[in-house]
Amino acid sequence: MKNEVHYLMSQKQLNRFLVLTKLIDGHITVKEAAESLNLSERHVKRLKKGVMNEGAAFLKHKNSNHKPLHAFSDSFIEKIISLKKSDTYKDANFKHFQELLLEHESIYISYSALYEILKKAGIKSPKKRRRFKPHRRRKRKSQEGLLIQMDATPFEWFGTNDKFALHGAIDDATGKILSLYITKNECLHGYFEVVKLIIIKFGIPVSIYTDRHAIFLSTNASKLSIEDQLAGKIVNDTQFGRAMKELGITLIPARSPQAKGRIERLWETLQSRLPVEFKIAGVKTIDEANAFLATYISKFNQQFSVEPEDTESAFRELPNDIDLNTVLCVKVTRTVDNGAVFSLYNKSFKILENNNNSSILPPRKSRIYVLINPAFGIKVQYEKTIFD
């Protein structure tokens, strides 16, 4: 059994340890780690192996004569084992458990020492839920906001048998989570909320990379023959596609799940970590989860994101004349009759003048947009006027 090691690390050693941790967790490549640390890839591989075997202690010079501050006691070992077996931490993988011990129990222990304790106690680290075989990684984009990967994943996030859909977006250049939003099922509203949160916090991205789900791409898109395309035939945008056009965002449908490798790896990490974080925070409902995720994203990004090659952001500021609520919604066209009445879902609705709006109601046979969103219900847009 190795002794518990509490080493005082220099800033340089600490920086190396943080970068190597990202490498070991699979969030950056050897090449990226080498560039960040200004070392050769061969040297980085040696450091990675050493840290995996010995933890942070490996980064201390072997001849420094730096001794551990104290050795393990039986009571300390029993405490570690007891905590790992507790309902709070039992589902945490070993690396996450090491971090949680420091964050919530004020216990620092090297990964290798922790591994030895738990291994001898017959405790195994939960296996990663790898959805796809690893593939060669595509080079990151150079700037934040150039390309956003977006997806949703159903999972038992609350530790029950019920699955909920976590919608999310990750920046390709930095690996930074831009937003997360959970709903009962994968849906348009969930994706609209993700985009809304991104734009409010960062701005409008240049492009969004998605799968070929019907939310993003019309099911008729694949039915167009070459002759149809040459003849100029097109298919209607989905509601999401229409909204992205209004915002000037290029929507790029991926050809395979492997093409969205960064967000697929994000889901693996979150499926391992987030249920444990929810349990510690007492999160049990969708509303509680969405409130918690706002703070969790910052914590996650501090640990796992990387610096972009180009520090200039590609996000664009939202123009003052664009109301996100009237863009990120279901928008359908209708025609009104003499009494400013239109039909929707086999029901008739009458447009009323706004109390604070002197605009004239749409005349007969006018084309209007009906806006539908869980946040505000139903609104009507006629030219530039919105009727509640």
Where do the protein language model's features map onto the residues?
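Residue-level signal for the short linker/turn that defines the boundary of a DNA-recognition helix
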Residues: 14, 27-28, 92, 109
